[in-house]
């Protein structure tokens, strides 16, 4: 036996067999650079190489938004499951079970209340990890519950949007959530409460055509896709080449659809300033009345 076979080979074999977590490294979706997942999480899932804002979970956004990461979530109303008895390659009820198991959420919207830079606020965050953040009856009812909570607490409502649109498994029931959520926004308007929307990537379909576009202030993360139909569908329909950056945050800001494009790290401070100004204006208006 030699030194090579007695020591080196077993050592190499042990190194190769050592368990390495599957999620130790993450590749940037934009530039392709590899980075440690823990480092990415410390940077709020923004690529340190190119600044690309990667997809975040609802709970991560709540932690980044509220002061000290402290907030209280509310229990959302229970809605009938699978009203149409829908089945394609898989039963809708089974898809919901899988989504709840993987995301540890009951629906694609999480509602919480707490403080943002000292300002009381209600925050509703859409969860792309739950069926791509699609909107069904339960999400519509959850949004209305967020509006009611804001009115009850006399607090502003901040909504982070991230959605693939209406949930096809619920058919017309899903489409009816567009006017349903609009009624929720009207409740805020009647109470004179600020309603701020933060667009994240992607915000599309029925969500973009309803409550997402009704904010008093529209903020967007950089390069977020904000659209009803995607650019490929539009290009195939009109048979013309679309402008560079079409339907992205910066393009929409230039054309008046978005007020501010802000980096993720800037959002808490920005929201705190905006909500503070708007709530002071409400106080002055109430006193004058």
Curated annotation (Swiss-Prot):
Biological process annotations from GO: fatty acid biosynthetic process; malonyl-CoA biosynthetic process
Cofactor field: Zn(2+)
Listed GO CC annotations: acetate CoA-transferase complex
Residue span, CoA carboxyltransferase N-terminal domain: 24-289
Enzyme Commission (EC) number: 2.1.3.15
A Pfam family of this chain: Zn_ribbon_ACC
Subcellular compartments: Cytoplasm
Catalytic activity: N(6)-carboxybiotinyl-L-lysyl-[protein] + acetyl-CoA = N(6)-biotinyl-L-lysyl-[protein] + malonyl-CoA
Lineage: superkingdom: Bacteria
DNA damage keyword on record: no
Cofactor binding mode and count: Binds 1 zinc ion per subunit.
Top-level EC class as recorded in UniProt: transferase
Functional description taken from the UniProt entry: Component of the acetyl coenzyme A carboxylase (ACC) complex. Biotin carboxylase (BC) catalyzes the carboxylation of biotin on its carrier protein (BCCP) and then the CO(2) group is transferred by the transcarboxylase to acetyl-CoA to form malonyl-CoA.
Protein family (similarity comment): Belongs to the AccD/PCCB family.
Protein name: Acetyl-coenzyme A carboxylase carboxyl transferase subunit beta
Species of the source: Gluconobacter oxydans (strain 621H) (Gluconobacter suboxydans)
């Amino acid at each position: 036996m030699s030194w090579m076979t007695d020591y080196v080979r077993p050592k190499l074999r042990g190194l190769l067999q050592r368990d390495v977590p599957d999620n130790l490294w993450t590749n940037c979706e934009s530039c392709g650079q590899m980075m440690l997942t823990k480092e990415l999480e410390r940077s709020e899932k923004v690529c340190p190489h190119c600044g690309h804002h990667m997809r975040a979970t609802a709970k991560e956004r709540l932690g980044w938004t509220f002061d000290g990461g402290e907030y209280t979530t509310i229990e959302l109303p229970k809605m009938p499951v699978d009203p149409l008895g829908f089945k394609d390659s898989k039963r809708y009820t089974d898809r919901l079970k899988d989504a709840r198991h993987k995301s540890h959420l009951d629906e694609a919207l999480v509602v919480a209340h707490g403080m943002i830079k000292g300002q009381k606020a209600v925050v509703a965050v859409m969860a792309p990890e739950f069926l791509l953040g699609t909107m069904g009856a339960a999400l519509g009812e959850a949004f209305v519950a967020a509006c009611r909570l804001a009115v009850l607490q006399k607090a502003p409502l901040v909504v982070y949007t991230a959605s693939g649109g209406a949930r096809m498994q619920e058919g017309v029931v899903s489409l009816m959530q567009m006017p349903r959520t609009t009624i929720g926004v009207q409740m805020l308007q009647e109470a004179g409460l600020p309603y701020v929307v933060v667009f994240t990537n992607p915000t599309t379909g029925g969500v973009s055509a309803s409550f997402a576009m009704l904010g008093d202030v529209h903020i967007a993360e950089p390069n977020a896709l904000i659209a009803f139909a995607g650019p490929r569908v539009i290009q195939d329909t009109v048979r013309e080449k679309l402008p560079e950056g079409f339907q992205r945050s910066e393009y929409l800001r230039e054309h008046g659809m978005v007020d501010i494009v802000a980096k993720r790290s800037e959002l808490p401070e920005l929201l705190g300033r905006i909500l503070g100004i708007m709530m002071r204006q409400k106080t002055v208006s109430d006193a004058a009345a």
